[in-house]
Curated annotation (Swiss-Prot):
It is found in: Mitochondrion inner membrane. The modification Phosphotyrosine is found at residue 218. Cu cation A1 binds at residues 161, 196, 200, 207. Component of the cytochrome c oxidase, the last enzyme in the mitochondrial electron transport chain which drives oxidative phosphorylation. The respiratory chain contains 3 multisubunit complexes succinate dehydrogenase (complex II, CII), ubiquinol-cytochrome c oxidoreductase (cytochrome b-c1 complex, complex III, CIII) and cytochrome c oxidase (complex IV, CIV), that cooperate to transfer electrons derived from NADH and succinate to molecular oxygen, creating an electrochemical gradient over the inner membrane that drives transmembrane transport and the ATP synthase. It catalyses: 4 Fe(II)-[cytochrome c] + O2 + 8 H(+)(in) = 4 Fe(III)-[cytochrome c] + 2 H2O + 4 H(+)(out). This is Cytochrome c oxidase subunit 2. Its EC number is 7.1.1.9. It comes from Vulpes vulpes. One of its GO terms (molecular function) is copper ion binding. It comes from the Eukaryota.
Length: 227
């Protein structure tokens, strides 16, 4: 999860987020090299005493600054497209959970079970227990098995919302009348926090998301109790 004065991205707990972190570093290095080159050229132009005012064209330079940006864009586009296809790939999910956005809470339904559904509201600040996080804790966490592919079906009952969990690399819009889907897989147990990431009204900041990733045996025990 995030911590105060954090400069980087949250720690990855899913294969997709690990790929996104690598892509971020890859793109950042390209931007750094371009910025350094531009700064170096500007410094040379400001400090040199050499001038050539009669130059009308320079085809070699024009060729270089046409081909080089094209190569750079390809180096950025190829890994980006690879990750986009990975995020859209859904193969034999072990569990399906339907998520509905409301003003201003989330509701969840485990579609593989006959009657396993609940609403998830933010816990008010005055009701928090010691150690709990302000504006991030909920009364009903989404308990899911780790190291298994989970499909999330996401929609909305009223206005636009967005279901986002940064540590898992997830952000999917919840649109009224439309059912979007995404997959998640956590590689380690723990609590993972997210929030609605689409401005949806006056209490937009007060509809957090909490995923509790647990071993399969614990999940089976929890689901049996809930049903």
């Amino acid at each position: 999860m995030a911590y105060p004065f954090q400069l980087g991205l949250q720690d990855a707990t899913s294969p997709i987020m690990e790929e996104l972190l690598h892509f971020h570093d890859h793109t950042l290095m390209i931007v750094f090299l371009i910025s350094s080159l531009v700064l170096y050229i500007i410094t040379l132009m400001l400090t040199t005493k050499l001038t050539h005012t009669s130059t009308m064209d320079a085809q070699e330079v024009e060729t270089v600054w046409t081909i080089l940006p094209a190569i750079i864009l390809i180096l950025i586009a190829l890994p980006s497209l690879r990750i986009l296809y990975m995020m859209d790939e859904i193969n034999n999910p072990s569990l399906t959970v339907k998520t509905m956005g409301h003003q201003w809470y989330w509701s969840y339904e485990y579609t593989d079970y006959e009657d396993l559904n609940f609403d998830s509201y933010m816990i008010p600040t005055q009701e928090l227990k010691p150690g709990e996080l302000r504006l991030l804790e909920v009364d009903n966490r989404v308990v899911l098995p780790m190291e298994m592919t989970v499909r999330m079906l996401i929609s909305s009952e009223d206005v636009l919302h967005s279901w986002a969990v940064p540590s898992l690399g997830l952000k999917t819009d919840a649109i009224p009348g439309r059912l979007n889907q995404t997959t998640l897989m956590a590689m380690r147990p723990g609590l993972y926090y997210g929030q609605c990431s689409e401005i949806c009204g006056s209490n937009h900041s007060f509809m957090p998301i909490v995923l509790e990733m647990v071993p399969l045996s614990y999940f089976e025990t929890w689901s049996a109790v809930m049903v």
